[in-house]
Amino acid sequence: GIGMTEEEVEKYITQIAFSGAADFLEKYEKAGGEGIIGHFGLGFYSAYMVSENIEIFTKSYRENAVGVHWESDGESTYTIEECDLANRGTRIVMHIAKDEKEFLEEGVIRSLIEKYCAFMPYPIYLNFTGKDDKALNDTQPLYLKAPKDCTEEEYKDFYRKTFHDYHDPLFWIHLNMDYPFRLKGILYFPK
């Protein structure tokens, strides 16, 4: 990734509800309001549900950037300091709570990613074996395609994979409209 400066860490990680959030939301909704998830760090803070402590090591792509180490236990305090990092990017280290160790098991992680991140627009990789595995999610799901570009077999495969049903659906309706609101999806009718 492009990493963050200390100021960006303060703004986007430390201050979830920074003073301009309401103004930003209002402007964002006027501009279409798509993709608001991920803009306030709420997803990041949900990591504290299973972690007792989280560290961020980051270095911005900007010229003369220095590394930043941020750490917090999720309460009201945190530490932030410079650190030595050779490359730009961000690494997040979650120290999993003792009673949440099941979330360190490959099968559990894989299952959660496939269930909750199946159609994220960015590829998600899980590397337990030391080699590059294929992405666990589909960054271009079938419902984003134009109906004319989809085959019957693709519709059936997507249904079986998404709904874990080995039967073919009875029929389906591919929704792709822009007015009076934007809607893309596939409505399946099981047998």
Features from the language model and the residues they span:
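GHKL/Bergerat-fold ATPase module in large chromosome/replication-associated machines
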Residues: 36, 54-77, 97-100, 107-191
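GHKL (Bergerat-fold) ATPase N-terminal catalytic module, capturing the glycine-rich phosphate-binding loop
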Residues: 1-98, 102-103, 111
